[in-house]
């Protein structure tokens, strides 16, 4: 198949540091190419995906800017709809692309929803029912029932990029944005209750600065100690942090749609201790790859009770369950179904059926195919 992957113009593919969606796009490009497909990624000019690359902006436009994303999407769709392009599937990870897909209804478009429930974007998706929507966790899909999500495909990473760690650093780790929904203040409190140091990797985005100063900086400066902030980390120092940690703390306070850092931790053998929100219960296999706890007190108790945890078993289970090759194969199967459905519709009508892009499209699609959900093994 000839496949176009449309990413954002805000972060490189793969990302240098922050950028979970862009890491997934990079893994898709790599493994779809490995499976024999002709892949073109639309991203920033400094990106290095497998296959071909096209770009509108040489460097990432950060912070994200709506105007830049629209120009990036316009550039991508100009190339996608060129007579010589002949893409079989366009898989976009960027919302503005949907507007361009709507004026090219003959282009088979797949869109992955990477975010939690957002009323503004739900209205956008309702306007473009001709796309095939993909979710990244069952919980995410449950929270946006208005959208016909055809399939849930859980993320995956390249296990060979994650060497085993011994967890002998004597600390627990936190990785993520220093934002209220990520719970860095809860991680500090749990580690202090457990009597261990917490080493923290992550950046502070401008909207989260007041929270950081009020909840995190205040804890760092209160004299209790036991906290090391490492700043935002690229791949190598992030792995070093995870490999030496006794556990990775994931005390989120929101409906996180997935959380790639959980499987990164598991792939080096470090268990994840997380609060029961969003996809956490889908990703953590209790007692094997981590533990789901209800609050800071339970998190602290679990930190103190990690002696005897089988890191080798954790890592092997993660390698079986969370590989990006598995993720790519599931996408490949979805693309094939989308193509088959499209070809069947054209044979039935003899011409392009413009109703596929209209208000009845979602209803017609439901009649053709029942939604499928990929569940964890």
Which residues make up each language-model segment?
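Catalytic cores of nucleotide-sugar-dependent glycosyltransferases that transfer UDP/GDP/TDP-activated
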Residues: 1-361, 365-368, 373-377
């Amino acid at each position: 198949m000839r496949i176009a992957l449309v990413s954002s113009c805000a972060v490189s593919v793969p990302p240098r540091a922050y950028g979970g969606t862009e890491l997934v796009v990079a893994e898709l490009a790599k493994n779809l190419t490995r499976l024999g497909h002709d892949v073109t990624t639309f991203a920033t000019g400094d990106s290095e995906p497998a296959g071909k690359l096209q770009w509108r902006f040489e460097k990432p436009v950060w912070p994200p800017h709506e105007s830049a994303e629209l120009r990036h999407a316009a550039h991508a769709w100009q190339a996608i709809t060129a007579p010589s392009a002949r893409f079989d599937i366009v898989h976009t990870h960027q919302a503005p692309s949907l507007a361009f897909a709507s004026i090219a209804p003959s282009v088979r478009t797949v869109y992955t929803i990477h975010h939690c429930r957002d009323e503004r974007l739900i209205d956008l998706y309702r306007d473009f029912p001709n796309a095939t929507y993909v979710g990244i966790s069952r919980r995410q899909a449950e929270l946006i029932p208005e959208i016909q999500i055809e399939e849930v495909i859980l993320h995956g990473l390249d296990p060979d990029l994650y060497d085993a760690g011994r967890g002998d650093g004597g600390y627990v780790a936190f990785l993520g944005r220093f934002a209220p929904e990520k719970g860095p203040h809860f991680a500090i409190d749990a580690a202090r209750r457990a009597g261990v140091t917490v080493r923290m990797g992550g950046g502070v985005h401008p909207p989260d600065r007041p929270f950081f100063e009020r909840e995190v900086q205040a804890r760092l400066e209160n004299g209790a100690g036991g906290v090391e902030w490492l700043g935002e980390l690229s791949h190598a120092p992030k792995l070093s942090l995870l490999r030496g940690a006794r556990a990775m703390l994931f005390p989120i306070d929101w409906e996180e749609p997935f959380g790639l850092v959980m499987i990164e931790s598991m792939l080096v053998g470090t268990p994840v201790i997380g609060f029961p929100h969003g996809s956490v219960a889908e990703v953590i296999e209790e007692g094997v790859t981590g533990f789901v706890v209800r609050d800071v007190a339970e998190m602290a108790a679990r930190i103190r009770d990690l002696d005897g945890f089988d890191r080798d078993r954790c890592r092997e289970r993660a390698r079986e369950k969370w590989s990006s090759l598995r993720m790519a194969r599931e996408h490949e199967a979805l693309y094939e179904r989308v193509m088959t459905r499209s070809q069947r519709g054209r044979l039935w009508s003899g011409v392009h059926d413009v109703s596929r892009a209209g208000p009845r499209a979602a209803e017609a699609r439901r009649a053709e195919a029942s939604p499928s959900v990929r569940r964890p093994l």
